[in-house]
């Protein structure tokens, strides 16, 4: 019994950290693909990022009461022994859904040739976990098998039906001419399985703004969907490249996840930042978070966001 207690204490210390940093300014949080989870019950914000640690640790959390300063909250996920996908752990998006917290995250196994895909974790004990895998080992991913996918995000429609939006990567085996794609997939209520077939929504080249200096349209990153309460518009933000990493938006013409989606011709943000998400803060203000610059070290960026006539207005960093 004594050995078990010692082992448990060691695990807790490795997760929280005896030297946890506190009062870290947002401008000092190094993080790609930042996703802010709002805990309205306790008046807190959480950020979970990819960070490799001891004993299979892969995801690390911060918490804040004001979006200006953050405290380290420790590791919130450790891979089970023998887990098939130890690589990447990109874009951990964390949602409160049906009374529990779920994390959609992109993983792979490069050595064994397992292509990237999105898997789903769940915490039964609040936003700081511990998170556990809920997709069985024989499937690993919630994204389609045999496709190189990433950046799965959750959207729950007006009927309470969960959907996942995700990217099919430009360098995978399922795309044409190295042009990335965005798809959607209806999920079951438990978020551990799918309903029906996935639907391809668009290719990078369908968006007039997503043109690199060479003229090519390649990358589709981070599709994130937001319903505008006033207009009813279903708006998708996603990231690609102009001359630098940028963000654009598209509107569903039916108000449904399956679209069709029409792209705004003007870029939303073109100052070398992206992989965005939208949230309302504890006061109800509309905010956007993303990483900027796109090169290391990428920094957590949070700023105000405005909507006019059912579309997001261009973003400017102060």
Listing of model-derived features with the role each one plays in the protein:
Residues 1-22:
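Bacterial Sec-dependent N-terminal signal peptides
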Residues 20-318:
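Carbohydrate-active catalytic/glycan-binding domains of CAZyme proteins
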